[in-house]
Amino acid sequence: MVTVKNPILMGFYPDPSICRKGEDYYIVNSSFVYAPGVPIFHSRDLAHWEQIGNILDRPSQLPVAGADISDGIYAPTIRYHDGLFYMITTNVTHGNNFIVTAENPEGPWSEPYYLGDDAPGIDPSLFFDDDGKCYYCGTRPNPEGVRYNGDWEIWIQELDLKTMKLVGESMAIWKGAVKGCIWPEGPHIYKIDGYYYLLHAEGGTGPEHSITVARSKKLFQWFEGCPRNPIFTHRNLGMDYPVIYAGHGDLVDDGKGNWYVVMLASRPCKKHSSMGRETFLARVIWENGWPVIAPGVGHLEDEFTIDMPEHRFAEEITNSDVIHFWGEQLDQRLVAIEDWTSGIYSLTEREGALRMYLRKEKISERANCAYLGVRQKS
């Protein structure tokens, strides 16, 4: 048995996506304009995590110059299929939706395959069907005309893995569970016991955030919603609850019939969320063909046990605060704004130390200043 303590990734690790290869689990998160981008983590017990790299680790993969601080890289999805890892995400500043691939999750990852104007919207995901075909699932504005802010829909289209281009016709499959839904986003598709399930967030990534689910026997048709939607939210607990904004989930199983979901949430302090949106884990069971998140509890737990052998790492993201400056590479937890390769630091001017080189830009400005930071955890 292993004890899971939430959040499993403390600090600014929003929009988590998870996949499994054998007994190994991998999580990726949004990174916006911070560089390198899209941190990737590894675990063997879902409780203890080590950072194994940053997927977008060179400027050619991460063109975010001039972007607003909350633009850049949105909501990545990670999947493993037939010997290859796929990460798909949105660069809302340059190029929009793209895919990178790797045989090893530690890298190197490929140059981006941009999907172009054929893939509008944000929060893309990939689904691999039983026949090996791959499908793109994303969000886009209501094509009949946006009636209100957040009037979007979820759509799918086949992806040719040889050309990395969308083929065939796209189809809208869902607009959200709640009447007048805003921001149906973060969609993920799974095939379980003969049904295609669509898990997604709605309500906006704030007080009304939630997780909803729909299903269908066929991929290219309108999905039916779960009668219990939203299947998970903290909106009913109030803004004084210790954990708020819960939503944006991704399911994973352990290969033995046990299911879990990762999601984002925030821990407020004096009405502010200084650590941003963090990554949490919850148990999932299935009843009458629908997922139940945090069964018997109904909210994110501070800690719980799961039937899995414990596996610890030398330096875990959950408890290690020490950063060294020995060697030729920066600690992978450190991030710059926009670009970390343009001479803002040195690790060789003084042995075992970091030297920063000033720029004329101020940190109070929205500019590419001389800056290296690490995510606050508590």
Predicted regions and their residues:
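Carbohydrate-active catalytic/glycan-binding domains of CAZyme proteins
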Residues: 1-378
